[in-house]
């Protein structure tokens, strides 16, 4: 590069930049910029011709103004004129301006291309370098059309200087990546391969990158590069060789070239025996050097050394043909598992995941199981813990399955929310794949539902039902186990589904025990009925009609339930239809017909586990899971089949996601088209600029919203296409909500746009901030969005989340209420009995108290009531109320503008099945809203 003369300092540019930096306000900056733009315009339009220095200075000022964020609509022609200058600095500024400001549709593109062609033909290495840099920086299709045929000629020309060859190789690589169809293969390809023997480090490094990319699409054209790459790698890593010794980086010879050569060799299978022997020597040398004491304590030395080592291990794993090398690589990675560097531990775990899939190294990987389990328990970085989970999954077999599953279940209780669903899938797969004793499998899945029920997908509980139905030896144990599990005060809904299905099929196997008589089984299931969603209630109704067949002694009790107004006049059409049909069936059908219609489910056909298919979709192609399944086929006795998809009685209805015992219909899908737009309400669009019509609230949205008043995590909405999950945390007046959008199909969602909608008054009381999500959601994938929440003042309404996307060419439009309620900003406050009643008396003004007497909607269980009050956000004060049956709580609602003390008292009346709820706060609107929210929970 030519030296820059003193006159090229451009003092005027320095003064202008200094003036901009000294501006005290944005207005002052804009004023100074406008003044300068006017000056530059006058200079460009003046009668006096500008010299090259002045043009360069003014073009630099325009470029600086553009980088400040201001539009530039003139000066382009002056920049193009600079391209024809013979002074390096002027030409450099011209190319810089062109690279940054000129787009491919510009009218000046022909002039620019002519200037670039002139520089490429000039044989001046400096000018050629500038032109190549410009082509690569712009990288447009138009550039590829104009120069893709010229650059290979420059690259392989014998008289081209090394610096230009390097630039040409990288420029061609850039054009090939953007427009591969415009880069023709030809005679130059064989000559490019021989650049691997070039003595200039920059040339051979750039050529290696180019050849690696080209070889992935054109392997036959570049297969001769294998022997040259092995030869060059051997000369670099062998101590006796002097090849590229001048390019030693912290005692490691040409590390980045070595990495690129090793990566190139992964494009081809193991070479012929002679070349393979030489490559094996290289890899052994790299592994041997990794065992040597470090020649320097500086981090640059270890980084370079480990970069070569990990790429060598990747090549060993990729070829998967040398048992000795695979075992040595595993042992080397095992040493890194306890290294103090977090990045090294992460990379070691990642590489060992792939090693575990090789039949040669699987046993060697298993020897490190205790270290990996320890990493799962002690690592601070969640990404390292994630890799530890992946490695445990990959190294699992029959010999260690129970230990690994137990450790995963233990970790699941504290795992990061973003990876819980994946861990659940892996535990379910391992428990099924390596189950010798299927009682252990049943225990594991039920424990899985207990620990992480919100993350147990339908595929998991479908699968346990399939396996229980297919295996006679476990049916009685499964019925007994789910019966015992359902006796817990609070059961997850997925456990109710599994319990309802299994007891409906095999409850007769435990009915002989007085502790699990038919009536007790029915009462136990029915006690959960009112706490469940519509699909689960539909399943339980099917279980009840199964009980009519299995246990005639409870027929009258079940008919009374089916005959009740809550069933026959249910607002949900599906539940109403089932109740009517089942009641009629139990009344008119003979015993033989009833037994035929309600006979036990037949075994499911043997197919691939739907859980494994879901995990493959979630992880994407070419993952450890795929490698394990394709490269390490072990003999596994797995029973199972497809998930039990219920049939619908109506051709127009969509199958319910719940397992349907009789296939008598399904829950209608969510609306799939945009309704007429409605006026009123301010759209605070924090996700997108879309202004499409917003759908009305999805069916069940209010029920799901109410379920989140006393909890922060779970599934907010689910239909056949989309699942929306939430995880939220709140502290004082601030909160953060993680929204997970899951694509349940195998087809991409396009134009995926979530929008947050707030009413006028809500916008002033609640501040919500977030960022857009990716508009494309792959099939089986999940995207996450974070919403930051600030409570400015108390509020009554909740935001609405509207999701619009295209699925299979059909427009989908879903709206749900986002469970951001006033009680989320509750901070519990512990108080003694005396303090509580003293404060209670202070809040005795009529406008400060709100009281509600209401009928119990759910079973009046003491433990559940306590859990709901605590989940509501209040502190539960023990031994404060003189009546031990009453519940009292205290807390403070935090907003940005004020703090509001809150006291509550809940008085249950078991005989009348009623409650009296009293709220006293220092603000009447807060008392009213909290009373409304909490009353809906009991």
Swiss-Prot record:
Keyword presence, RNA-binding: no
Spans annotated as Disordered: 615-681
GO biological process: clathrin-dependent endocytosis; intracellular protein transport; postsynaptic neurotransmitter receptor internalization; regulation of hematopoietic stem cell differentiation; synaptic vesicle endocytosis; vesicle-mediated transport
Annotated Gene Ontology cellular component terms: AP-2 adaptor complex; cytoplasmic side of plasma membrane; cytoplasmic vesicle; membrane coat; postsynapse; presynapse; secretory granule
Subcellular location: Cell membrane; Membrane, Coated pit
Extent of Low complexity compositional bias: 646-667
Keywords: Cell membrane, Coated pit, Endocytosis, Lipid-binding, Membrane, Protein transport, Transport
Effect of residue 840 to A: Abolishes AMPH, BIN1, DGKD, EPS15, EPN1, auxilin and SNAP91 binding
Entry-linked Gene3D superfamilies: 2.60.40.1230, Leucine-rich Repeat Variant, TATA-Binding Protein
Effect caused by changing residue 782 to A: Reduces DENND1A- and DENND1C-binding
UniProt keyword Protein transport, yes or no: yes
Effect of residue 56 to E: Strongly reduces phosphatidylinositol binding
SUPFAM superfamilies: ARM repeat, Clathrin adaptor appendage domain, Subdomain of clathrin and coatomer appendage domain
Stated consequence of mutating residue 57 to Q: Strongly reduces phosphatidylinositol binding. Abolishes phosphatidylinositol binding
Tissue distribution: Expressed in the brain (at protein level).
GO MF annotation: an example: clathrin adaptor activity
Effect of residue 21 to E: Reduces interaction with CD4 endocytosis signal motif
Protein name: AP-2 complex subunit alpha-2
Native organism: Mus musculus (Mouse)
Taxon lineage: Eukaryota, Metazoa, Chordata, Craniata, Vertebrata
Gene name linked to the record: Ap2a2
